[in-house]
Design a protein with these regions (language model features):
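Acidic carboxylate-rich catalytic motifs and surrounding loops in phosphoryl-/glycosyl-chemistry enzymes
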Residues: 39-42, 190-191, 306-312
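Active-site clefts of carbohydrate-active enzymes
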Residues: 263-265, 347-352
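Beta-rich nucleic-acid/ligand-interaction surfaces
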Residues: 39-49, 152-155, 159-161, 313-316
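Substrate-binding cleft of carbohydrate-active enzyme catalytic domains
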Residues: 109-307, 319, 325-327
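Substrate-binding cleft/loops of secretory-pathway carbohydrate-active enzymes
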Residues: 303-342
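Contiguous, structured surface segment used for ligand recognition
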Residues: 1-112
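Extracellular/periplasmic catalytic domains that process cell-envelope and extracellular macromolecules
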Residues: 64, 107, 251, 318-320, ...
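Hydrophobic anchor at the start of a short beta-strand
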Residues: 36, 186, 303, 350-351
Length: 352
């Protein structure tokens, strides 16, 4: 049983473990009514001990709750963070009097992701995003993507974001740092093909839109989602989105980048119609996706893209760089496996 003589003791841990001690301290304060200081050094009876044991596999931790002490051993700093989340959950359920317990735990899935739409509706503030990061850490989520169309403050695209409160470079970098110490990889995600309404409806960029004069049609969420695909027959289109990537990617320490490229409903139906009739819609789509993937791979970055369009011709996945990851999504409560099965048969790596 913990009491006011107890300590949260860090033993043979990385400096980052101070944060986990603070997490545990806050949990004990809120749910057990105890103000338990933390320290470093050799633990005593009655302490809650957080320690790294390199004899354990890196992703594994053991939690032992006995009358004389609480001991959390982990194979790595990340596993220690995960173990603290489990201990906090147990304290939330039982308060200061904790039933005896032995746990050995590790993740079955190496990549545990969460996707957050920051483009439709109100743009979240940094303080709120940090709260989300805390929740994701509690649930041991280790990858997080913010979906961005126009809601990042691109320096040359004020026409696109001036009616919103876009996230700034400083905010993204601060959030990236906040996530990193919680073992969450903040992965950049940026529309580079479909879903580019705000950007492609500006006077500066409307010539890059697949549909002529589409910038003159009043905004609606349905219209914006179904139209405003990049006109890949325009020789300036590829360079334009590469420029967006070049401005956005350096803000993140992640070695991944999601180019999205989903729901390109307009492709081959407007300005690129003649080229699509000559080459095929598949060729136009694949050429653009492949060019962006190769561009990222050349910089040591793992490209990701949404698989809804590629599923129409899954054999074409073999033409993409081998490092590419297909993100296979679905919203149904009982999601079918057709898309996952077909993409898997192509040999490409995928997230489901």
């Amino acid at each position: 049983m913990l009491d006011n003589q107890s300590r949260i003791t860090l033993w043979q841990t990385e400096p980052a473990a101070l944060l986990y001690a603070q997490m545990l301290q806050g949990c004990l304060r809120e749910y057990a009514g105890l103000e338990v200081p933390f320290t470093r050094g050799k633990p005593r009876a009655g302490d809650a001990v957080l320690t790294v044991d390199t004899a354990l596999p890196q992703n594994r931790y053991t939690l032992s709750i006995m009358p004389e002490c609480i001991t959390l051993k982990a194979g790595s700093d990340e596993a220690l963070c995960n173990g603290v989340q489990t201990l906090c959950q147990y304290i939330e359920q039982h308060g200061a009097v904790l039933p005896a317990l032995e746990i050995e735990d590790w993740p079955d899935l190496a990549n545990r992701g969460y996707y957050h739409d920051c483009s439709r509706g109100r743009v979240p503030k940094l303080d709120y995003l940090k709260q989300v990061a805390d929740i994701l850490c509690r649930y041991k989520i280790n990858q997080w993507q913010l979906y961005i169309e126009h809601t990042y403050l691109f320096r040359d695209l004020s026409e696109a974001w001036r009616e919103d409160t876009p996230l700034t470079a400083q905010e993204i970098m601060e959030l990236d740092d906040y996530c990193a110490v919680r073992h969450i990889e903040l992965v950049p995600s940026l529309s580079t093909f479909g879903h580019m309404y705000r950007i492609l409806s500006t006077k500066t960029c409307c010539d890059l839109c697949e549909l002529p004069d589409s910038e003159k049609i009043p905004f609606s969420y349905t219209y914006a989602g179904n139209h405003h695909t990049l006109n890949v027959s325009n020789p300036d289109a590829l360079g334009f989105v590469k420029g967006l990537i070049d401005e956005y990617r350096p803000l993140f320490r992640s070695s991944k980048f999601n180019i999205c490229d989903d729901e390109t409903f307009d492709l081959g139906k407007g300005r690129s119609k003649a080229l699509a009739e000559e080459q095929s819609e598949r060729s136009l789509y694949l050429s653009h996706v492949k060019a962006l993937c190769e561009y990222l791979v050349a910089q040591g970055v793992t490209p990701q893209f949404w698989g809804d369009i590629m599923w129409r011709f899954p054999e074409s996945c073999a033409e993409l760089p081998k490092e590419t990851i297909c993100l296979n999504w679905g919203y149904l409560p009982h999601q079918r496996e057709n898309e996952i099965r077909d993409i898997a048969a192509s040999g490409i790596t995928q997230y489901a």
